[in-house]
Amino acid sequence: MQGSVIEFLKPNLVGIEQINATRAKVTLGPLERGFGHTLGNALRRILLSSMPGTAVTEVEIDGVQHEYSTKEGVQEDILEILLNLKGLAVKLEGKDNVLVSLTKSGAGPVTAGDITHGSDVEIVNPEHVICHLTGNAEISMRIKIESGRGYVPASSRIHTEEDERPIGRLLVDATFSPVERIAYSVESARVEQRTDLDKLVIDMETDGTLDPEEAIRRAATILAEQLDAFVDLRKVSEPVAKEEKPEFDPILLRPVDDLELTVRSANCLKAETIHYIGDLVQRTEVELLKTPNLGKKSLTEIKDVLASRGLSLGMRLENWPPASLSED
């Protein structure tokens, strides 16, 4: 069938070759000459930089104050452990960030499967090695995992001097993209008498948290949405009324008494006019340790109780307190 000389061919999905659970080849064609590289390069850049995913952003290891130290009984130094933690492949369900914990003792490897987490967390690579213990050594750590996009260096998340970054909180460079490798090639294609057409072949590998086929679909959707504004430059879009969402997580509006702390810890917080959980999470460890009669034991209790609810000290809450919140 002979088409118009100005009519563009519309590509169709030629095939998907699933090489393994994390790698696939997607073939798209036929494409007009030159469009193989045009679409291939655009999709490649989006897949590498714009796919949402999860990453470890903060780590606290008992007995470790900074990343340049070592821990007795652990073969790897702290920098190696942080690097290994970056290799965790995690899925989060219904949450943007979570705190998980890991405690292990005795000689042998410490793997991602040793991490204690809730039902809203799935570790895709439980066999991933984090470190190795010798003798009767023990290691205990708390790991913060967040959702995000692209690459966010630790330097961009370091607290200001006014925030007094807590000692022992180790920030990690976060690579959120689930796409680990992608390459594309353009091959020749033929339709009837035309032999100058392109066929795009995308070879992609992910960390297992995102199916390669779904990743291609998301990248194409992002590209289409970004180009949609150019379809009708004169079109004036009307503002869409957004559904109002709670300004703060309801748990932050609850009184500190709901944490069921010991009497000593609760009284210390009330003496500092810390009445709501939202007041508490904005305080840093250094600030709390300056509170009269509040020692390290009480601080550990507070941190553990917050961690069990997916919270931590040193959080930033914009526009706190809300106008509707009444002071005790």
Swiss-Prot record:
Q: Name one GO molecular function term.
A: protein dimerization activity
Amino-acid biosynthesis keyword on record:
no
UniProt keyword terms in alphabetical order? DNA-directed RNA polymerase, Nucleotidyltransferase, Transcription, Transferase
The GO annotation for biological process reads: DNA-templated transcription
Q: Which Pfam families match?
A: RNA_pol_A_bac, RNA_pol_A_CTD, RNA_pol_L
Organism superkingdom: Bacteria
Q: Where is this region: Alpha C-terminal domain (alpha-CTD)?
A: 248-328
Region feature Alpha N-terminal domain (alpha-NTD), mapped onto this chain? 1-234
What function does the entry list? DNA-dependent RNA polymerase catalyzes the transcription of DNA into RNA using the four ribonucleoside triphosphates as substrates.
Q: Which family does it belong to?
A: Belongs to the RNA polymerase alpha chain family.
Q: What is this protein called?
A: DNA-directed RNA polymerase subunit alpha 2
Q: What is the lineage of its organism?
A: Bacteria, Pseudomonadati, Pseudomonadota, Gammaproteobacteria, Alteromonadales
